[in-house]
Amino acid sequence: MKIHKGDMVLVISGPDKGAKGKVIQAFPKTEKVLVEGVNRIKKHVANSAPERGAESGGIVTQEAPIHVSNVMVLDSDGNPTRVGYRFDENGKKVRISRRNGKDI
């Protein structure tokens, strides 16, 4: 998967179109990412199950995963770009911006 934890992304489709955020977590098996402040849902949590900030249960607002096809990585200039790969001088695979050719 070309999007990793810590990347800044732009949402390109869906209700949150145009929103920018940082990837909190990536799920390669399902090809989904968790983006900070995007796709917020309200989850009802039981009193006995403390989870993600809910100390005593109730209704918790949290981010839900979004498919990677609905986001684009932002390059160093802050522009949305597709991700490519190249090998550096040590033979290590690095991600590059397709827009300007710089490393991500």
Swiss-Prot record:
SUPFAM superfamilies according to UniProt: Translation proteins SH3-like domain (SSF50104)
> GO terms for biological process?
translation
According to its UniProt entry, the function of this protein is described as: One of two assembly initiator proteins, it binds directly to the 5'-end of the 23S rRNA, where it nucleates assembly of the 50S subunit.
Keyword annotations for this protein, in alphabetical order, are: Ribonucleoprotein, Ribosomal protein, RNA-binding, rRNA-binding
Protein family membership: Belongs to the universal ribosomal protein uL24 family.
What Gene Ontology terms describe what this protein does at the molecular function level?
A: rRNA binding; structural constituent of ribosome
How is this protein named in the record? Large ribosomal subunit protein uL24
Pfam families, sorted? KOW, ribosomal_L24
Keyword ATP-binding assigned to the entry: answer is no
HAMAP family listed in its UniProt record: Ribosomal_uL24_B
Which InterPro entries did the record assign?
KOW (IPR005824), Rib_uL2_dom2 (IPR014722), Ribosomal_uL24 (IPR003256), Ribosomal_uL24_CS (IPR005825), Ribosomal_uL24_KOW (IPR041988), Translation_prot_SH3-like_sf (IPR008991)
Q: What organism, scientifically named, is this protein from? A: Corynebacterium diphtheriae (strain ATCC 700971 / NCTC 13129 / Biotype gravis)
Assembly description:
Part of the 50S ribosomal subunit.
What's in the GO CC field?
ribonucleoprotein complex; ribosome
**Gene3D superfamilies in the cross-refs:** 2.30.30.30
